[in-house]
């Protein structure tokens, strides 16, 4: 069956044409998104051209136990190893003791981009500047202190029993 499809030049040609059209369309859309995003220097574009912000899900009536369980999961499953290790260890140490207000603040922090959280926690503001909304955050200050790893512990994902 496959042999007959690929032996017909018209079928193969139409498939290639379809892929070519899709690639051109994607390239055109990328050009339109990037257009006008220069950083002030003529002919130079930002390294990050588009940031799409997806609003977080509004959770109403969530119990504290459910919120803690969700925050544990979100701290452990970020997608970037560095942030996973940092946030999962932080959650294992502090999440049980957090007040409802602190849990809400931590929840809002987890809605930020992974690399932003990592650079803010490690106080590397030259790469990702700290927004005003986080400058007075007690949770972020606690995370920054925690990220210094003053005890020089070997970082590994904490066991779920630690939460």
From Swiss-Prot:
It holds the Pfam family Sdh5. Its main location: mitochondrion. It comes from the Eukaryota. The keyword Oxidoreductase does not apply. Keywords: Chaperone, Mitochondrion. It is found in: Mitochondrion matrix. Signal peptide: none annotated. One of its GO terms (biological process) is mitochondrial respiratory chain complex II assembly. GO terms for cellular component: mitochondrial matrix. Belongs to the SDHAF2 family. Interacts with the flavoprotein subunit within the SDH catalytic dimer. PANTHER family: PROTEIN EMI5 HOMOLOG, MITOCHONDRIAL, SUCCINATE DEHYDROGENASE ASSEMBLY FACTOR 2, MITOCHONDRIAL. Plays an essential role in the assembly of succinate dehydrogenase (SDH), an enzyme complex (also referred to as respiratory complex II) that is a component of both the tricarboxylic acid (TCA) cycle and the mitochondrial electron transport chain, and which couples the oxidation of succinate to fumarate with the reduction of ubiquinone (coenzyme Q) to ubiquinol. Required for flavinylation (covalent attachment of FAD) of the flavoprotein subunit of the SDH catalytic dimer. This protein may be expected to contain an N-terminal transit peptide but none has been predicted. This is Succinate dehydrogenase assembly factor 2, mitochondrial. It comes from Kluyveromyces lactis (strain ATCC 8585 / CBS 2359 / DSM 70799 / NBRC 1267 / NRRL Y-1140 / WM37).
